[in-house]
């Protein structure tokens, strides 16, 4: 996402530092909604006359990981500023505060809720009657829940009453499966979350060919995140939430294009088993295999609230549109790339649970590959290229833990992966990419390693716009790109004949002509045949976060722009034919498209600084 300054730290030979500040402003909707709650100023004003009750007491009795809860309010002294917060764990008073949260005078509260609604939600008569019934949707987050009624609004909160405690029947259950490619083409990883430490239960995945026996059991590794591994507030303070245990298992030696079934399990110390849901996935085709292959790409989605909790209505208003459209279209694609700004937790750590629950129908069925964005990584003095606070103190730790990706070093969020006729080079725009850096060397090696006879479709992706965008603040800066974005990389895109480069960060959709050094090198708009001559750059940051304005002047390289939420679908029919489609999330219809038709000799053709050395010697 675009908020936070574009304050960029880089080093020259003399270790000279320069900060670049963008022209755009941080808007109110850029802030995490929970940041509006002045936690430390909370005072106590318990009233015996106020009643707040939650039902049912036990959730998920049939194994569900999501449940609806009814909260009834009776308040003899209601006001417009009353609001109801959801807390988990249920005990949220000062006894749970860490030393780092302590101020000169210890506050009563030191943690933010998971979400909230105003007490008059959907009932205009609350201010007169003091009675209302609120419905909340909860997910299993490994702890019990309570509901708190506050008066005084978000800035001067007064805690008035706390409800009874409710809980899921098994808070520790294995949940929220998410698939990703391993480092080998015939390897799939399964990552999930549970409340079981390795001291009390052994995690594994049971899997095999769908409908066949015997089944294989593969062990899982387990990672945890501690509060002191966060780099700053709010992740390290009021936004902290225990994420339990993250398990990852590697399913190896898969047959290509084959359907498998799987389920996560834990063996308890008494020998009994706890099982997760049953899922299926289709393994990847062999690199270069000629078959129908379909890819989804987008960025900047975030999370939504299906119960109408109003704090997310302006921050990530399109998140559920995109999620629901992808769930609906699930049989018609094979892999997803979410290229940065994943959950927009921004240091309110419980959002990571809620995001993995939101995308679970997708991520449990097809590989869900992620990239790093500013809202995952950026934090001052933490090694990020940009010296801003957009990650809310997470400094990359949570994204690196919650999702698997086949990088050599998870703290350096760049990697390559294959899917049949596609070769993907995923860059990390939150680390230095310029010539001479470690990442630049990776990018060149990744692009150079593509066997274009077998894998003709070469795709580059990064979160920030390292190519072209006519977004309003880039236009104000006069760059139409992230500062220094394409300066080093465009010669690599041209040399290795990258077909399409994708970016997020800017919350809209835009497609360029095939371009090199700011000049269109092909006059086509809807169909390209033979030698394309340049890379097509696509901004696809309309995954769900609030939208970004375009500049009013349209550059000559901008073919199509759309101020809406959406995603891109690539379909490779064979090694000679590729279909590109941009779909709106609201209806799933195609609003922009083009095709590429070519042969292997067209990829080899000498054009614009992509010519191999030759000799006249016989």
Sequence positions of predicted segments:
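Eukaryotic intrinsically disordered and solvent-exposed regulatory patches
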Residues: 53-58, 68-72, 120-122, 131-136, ...
